[in-house]
């Protein structure tokens, strides 16, 4: 893991079960002794215009380099590539560091963890058998099962899109077997406080140290049998038959914000204390069964649209996925495994990209660190496009809408970038983006990756693809066409005539 030294354990990525609803994401580790759940809310980001140096420090970063284009193009046509390269390296970057420790305060931004949950079970591995972890792609539910001392234990995990709540149930086939201690470890680069919400709940309210972004995490437990106590920021359950934990979270980030280059709080517009309170009250009122039914019906409407059937599966259909992978690497054909991977990709997109929040980032929605590889940002040079290549073609058109909403927030800053660097109309983006409308190149002079002026037009192709599949003329008229046209304006102005009359970029 790149970046900060906090929490470098990579097991969450290679060994956990990922669940999500496009806003909340979690990774289920499944330990018998203490369940560990990494937790994310997709709009919790460091950086942006509200750091200590304010909006101008964040927005006023474009170099006025357009006047050099003619000189660079002339050098190219005369074969002086060294001069063209030098001018490009020196003038088509910015002073914005991509590394969190490269400037103070860090302004580019990074997706950051909302912390982790731990549930101590009072159990140990002695006498444990029949251990299983299951990720059901059909129901978007993670399950942990095992037996110990002739008791069958089960944990169920899902995150509901309609309710915006994560639901965690601990149960067993014998009564009085749940003895649990639930605790929360927040983002270490934030300042906050935990308070009790009655006897059953906890509320953690905090803000990130870097930019003051406010976030709230709410937890509530409901038990059958036994006792429940709430003290010192922990929920303690004794001798219960069943325990259901409801968890929700939000930040003060406003989806589809309209960038104001003078207002450092331009992206703020939500009260997470109120939103999380409403979600929690609604979830608890519904209860586990009703929430799961609602969750399943919502998810299945998307997932069940497509069935992939390749050649009849070879022997080994009932083997664990880990064993199937080992066999596959040895050259054994397994069409069912290929079908499974196809559907797993659809599952991950549904889990990380739903209307009403940001698009899937470099890690979808899952992250266990305060910083991460490539800031866990939006890489506009192919990665974000790759996330959405299978969206429409696998009948998940709705999952593209967060990407289109994200593109809309790039237009105003992207117009400034297009004008400053290329003297062009329209808008464009650069190599990396974030949730705060960043469209400028970074400080590196390595133009093999930092020079990416066609990022905007590439993003715009996804807008056309969405229309091409949906034939939603209302969308095209009200939203899509202007975004595409403005991107095309940039592309037209970016082209230039070589001396032989041919257009080139």
Locations of the language-model features?
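Aromatic-residue-lined binding/catalytic grooves and analogous aromatic/hydrophobic interfacial grooves
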Residues: 1-447, 465-467, 474-477, 481, ...
């Amino acid at each position: 893991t790149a970046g900060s030294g906090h929490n470098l354990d990579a097991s969450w990525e290679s060994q956990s079960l990922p669940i999500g609803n496009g806003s909340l994401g979690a990774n289920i580790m499944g330990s018998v002794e203490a369940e560990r759940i990494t937790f994310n809310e997709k709009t919790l980001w460091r950086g942006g215009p509200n750091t200590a140096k304010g909006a101008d420090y964040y927005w006023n970063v474009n170099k006025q380099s357009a006047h050099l284009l003619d000189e660079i193009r002339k050098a190219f046509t005369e074969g002086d590539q060294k001069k063209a390269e030098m001018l490009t390296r020196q003038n088509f970057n910015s002073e914005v560091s991509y590394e969190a420790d490269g400037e103070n305060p860090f302004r580019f931004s990074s997706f950051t963890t909302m912390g982790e949950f731990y549930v101590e079970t009072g159990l140990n591995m002695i006498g444990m058998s029949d251990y299983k972890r299951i990720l059901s792609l059909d129901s978007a539910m993670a399950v942990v099962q095992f037996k110990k001392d002739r008791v069958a234990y089960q944990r169920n995990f899902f995150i509901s899109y309609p309710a915006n709540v994560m639901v965690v149930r601990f149960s067993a086939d014998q009564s009085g077997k749940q003895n649990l201690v639930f605790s929360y470890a927040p983002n270490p680069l934030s300042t906050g406080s935990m308070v009790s919400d009655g006897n059953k709940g906890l509320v953690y309210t905090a803000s990130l140290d870097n930019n003051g972004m406010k976030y709230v995490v709410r937890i509530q437990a409901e038990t059958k049998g036994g006792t429940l106590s709430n003290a010192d920021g922990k929920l303690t359950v004794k001798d219960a038959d069943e325990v259901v934990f409801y968890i929700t979270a939000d930040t003060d980030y406003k989806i589809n914000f309209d960038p104001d280059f003078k207002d450092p709080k331009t992206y703020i517009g939500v009260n997470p204390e109120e939103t999380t309170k409403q979600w929690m009250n609604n979830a608890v009122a519904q209860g586990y069964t009703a929430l799961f039914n609602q969750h399943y019906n919502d998810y299945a409407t998307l997932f069940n649209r497509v069935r992939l059937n390749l050649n009849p599966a070879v022997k080994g259909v009932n083997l664990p996925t880990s064993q199937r992978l080992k066999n596959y690497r040895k050259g054994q054909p397994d069409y069912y495994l290929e079908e499974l991977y196809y559907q797993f990709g659809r599952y991950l997109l549904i889990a990380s990209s739903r209307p009403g929040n940001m698009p899937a980032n470099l890690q979808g929605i899952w992250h266990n660190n305060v910083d991460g590889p490539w800031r866990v940002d939006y890489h506009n040079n192919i990665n974000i496009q790759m996330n959405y290549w299978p969206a429409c073609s696998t009948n998940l058109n709705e999952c593209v809408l967060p990407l289109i909403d994200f593109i809309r927030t790039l237009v105003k800053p992207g117009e400034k970038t297009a004008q400053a660097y290329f003297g062009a109309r329209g808008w464009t983006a650069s190599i990396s983006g974030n949730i705060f409308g960043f469209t400028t190149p970074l400080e590196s002079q390595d133009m093999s990756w930092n020079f990416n002026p066609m990022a905007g037009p590439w993003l715009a192709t996804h807008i056309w693809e969405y229309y091409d599949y949906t034939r939603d003329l209302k969308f095209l008229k009200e939203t899509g066409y202007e975004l595409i046209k403005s991107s095309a304006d940039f592309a037209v102005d970016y082209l230039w005539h070589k001396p032989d009359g041919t257009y080139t970029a």
